[in-house]
Regions:
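Conserved catalytic alpha/beta cores of large enzymes that bind or transform nucleotide phosphates
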Residues: 26, 115, 181-184
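Hydrophobic mid-bilayer segments of alpha-helices in multi-pass membrane transport proteins
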Residues: 19-26
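Short, small-residue-biased leader/transition segments that mark boundaries at the very start
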Residues: 1-6
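Short, hydrophobic/aliphatic alpha-helical segments
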Residues: 96-102, 176
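Hydrophobic alpha-helical bundle architecture
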Residues: 7-16, 28-59, 73-94, 104-139, ...
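Final/C-terminal transmembrane alpha-helix of multipass membrane proteins
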Residues: 62-63, 171-193
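Lipid-exposed faces of alpha-helical membrane segments in multi-pass integral membrane proteins
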Residues: 22, 56, 60-67, 129-132, ...
Length: 203
């Protein structure tokens, strides 16, 4: 579950690399600003346009998952007749029910396709909402990464200097890890605190 929230490992038919690439662009940009240099990645300048696209790609994943989960929670609490009309959705309301909602959208957005069996998800709401999440989380990142690649391909080659942050350095690895932790991992911490962590502590 935690890996699906971050989506930064290689695999998943290229999706792990695709999202890791967005985090690297953000890490390079922030690192360049910290030392007062124009950010460079693979000997090409990284400017505002690339950063904006990478930010959209990185933030889209938690956005669609958390919005979907919030919508499901809202309907579960404030539209019980709608939920009952679809079979009631969950057998275990509370911490575990929220975990099931969260996992359903996380799985849809992260090339997984699995789900908790306690959630009755073969309904109109779940099929359509998860389909929308799936489409957004697949195609927008692909379009964004291709756009970044096109922008970088059109830029002049810049020779490396002593001030260039090399992508095979420990500093770059640490910066990329920090970006992934802050942008991806912490985005999900509040909802996990109310679901999976709360359920674990209550056992």
């Amino acid at each position: 579950g935690s890996e699906m929230c971050i989506r930064d490992r290689f695999g998943g038919v290229g999706v792990g690399w695709m999202n890791y690439f967005a985090f690297m662009i953000i890490a390079v940009f922030i690192s360049g600003l910290m030392v007062g240099r124009t950010p460079e990645f693979l000997c090409k300048k990284v400017e505002a346009r690339e950063m904006k696209i990478a930010s959209i790609v990185a933030l889209l994943h938690p956005f669609v998952i958390l919005v979907g989960t919030a919508l499901a929670c809202y309907l579960f609490v404030y539209a019980p007749s709608f939920v009952e009309g679809e079979g009631g959705w969950v057998n275990n309301p509370g911490f575990h029910g929220l975990s099931e909602f969260l996992y359903e959208y996380t799985s849809s957005a992260a090339n997984n396709g699995s789900g908790f069996e306690g959630l009755a998800d073969n309904t109109w709401f779940w099929n359509y909402s998860c389909g929308i999440v799936l489409i957004l989380s697949r195609f927008i990142p692909i379009i964004g990464q291709v756009a970044i690649a096109g922008l970088l391909a059109g830029k002049k080659y810049i020779p490396e200097t002593s001030g260039t942050l090399k992508t095979d350095s420990v500093t770059f690895s640490a910066m990329t890890f920090a970006v992934i932790f802050i942008v991806a991992a912490l985005s999900f911490f509040p909802v996990h605190a109310l679901s999976t962590i709360a359920e674990h502590l209550s056992l």
